[in-house]
């Protein structure tokens, strides 16, 4: 048994300049693991609680009382004494002990950020002690599937101060032989998009996730630019065949739902400020009207995937969406399911989605995350491994995507080091796999539950 000998947490900064927690774990046999916890901007109401220093003795340390020293103290003073001496390879036991120590449904006592930091650092320490890559430790020797990247090249919603209500407009390079070739294709599209934006007089500043954040007149205008950038790069806007590059959307509809209607608040405000009537013809939608709007977009553009097309409380909207379009398009639940097994079971029973987004900090432990992934895959769903808008140089999700053969990873655009770090890690993993056997990149086939 390889015992944990030391656990130490500290407060550092994430990609938005906000405090987050980093945890180091040491083992008796010389293993070491360190993990940095991400943070989201648009969050589901049922997510595990990220503990901040509001109304504590640390409240005034950082802007907006966003410090995490309370979570740091919880690791160093409460969690550490309980897990020191345990075997670092017994991940589930350690995760369960932390869940029991917390004792709340959403980890609000110790903080999901405190618990997750320890959970991930333990796994990394075990892998390090065994002198193997994290993806091998988590997945064994079988996984060889490299994920198709979902690159958020146009940001909107809560991730950017622009006019777009949809949060992410992504490209998915499908028609390529390797992950590296796919990334090279995405690189060309990204830079050609910048060129086209500049040529049309748009700014090319980037949002939280490294994508451009122009003030477009409509969501359709954003999609038109994506199609043009794909063509300008010499690729095929579509799902199938050589050089195919598809589009994916994260609508994050909970952010523009007022409890009764879906309102494109940002586009509407832009229209009013410009006194223009020729922008999006409609800014307010019932659930049924929004479904029809998505149908128009799916008919016009090569969109393969839509995430959070409806608000997290609008189960009927999701069910209707999946029933109508789920045979040919990936219908992803994020805020709807928050990487929670019990909520995922409901979504499966209701046939509300055919894919789940996986975010480690939504649930708060590695074990629970793996449970959600395995349940989704067992039920015929795809599982998309995802970053958060507040990220760091931590590359855990890259290893996780390969370990579980998810086939898809969503980790931002091709700018900002916090996003690039994950892509660089995947390039290294692909090289590692090719040195032993052959890394697989199967493009369109990752959508194994869609009609061919």
From Swiss-Prot:
Entries under CDD domains matching the protein: enolase
User: Which Gene Ontology biological process is one annotated for this entry?
Assistant: glycolytic process
A cellular component term from Gene Ontology for this protein is: extracellular region
- UniProt-listed Enzyme Commission number(s): 4.2.1.11
**Residues involved in (2R)-2-phosphoglycerate binding:** 167, 359, 388-389, 410
- Reaction(s) catalysed by this chain's protein: (2R)-2-phosphoglycerate = phosphoenolpyruvate + H2O
Query: What is its pathway?
Result: Carbohydrate degradation; glycolysis; pyruvate from D-glyceraldehyde 3-phosphate: step 4/5
What domain of life does the native source organism fall in? Bacteria
Q: Which cofactor does it need?
A: Mg(2+)
Q: What is its main location?
A: cytoplasm
Molecular-function GO terms, alphabetical: magnesium ion binding; phosphopyruvate hydratase activity
Q: How is the cofactor bound?
A: Binds a second Mg(2+) ion via substrate during catalysis.
Which terms are listed as keywords in the entry?
Answer: Cytoplasm, Glycolysis, Lyase, Magnesium, Metal-binding, Secreted
Could you tell me which Gene3D superfamilies the record lists for this protein?
Enolase-like C-terminal domain, Enolase-like, N-terminal domain
Give compartment(s). Answer: Cytoplasm; Secreted; Cell surface
| NCBIfam families in alphabetical order | eno
The entry's family comment says: Belongs to the enolase family.
Q: What does this protein do?
A: Catalyzes the reversible conversion of 2-phosphoglycerate (2-PG) into phosphoenolpyruvate (PEP). It is essential for the degradation of carbohydrates via glycolysis.
Q: What is this protein called?
A: Enolase
**Biological source species:** Mesomycoplasma hyopneumoniae (strain 232)
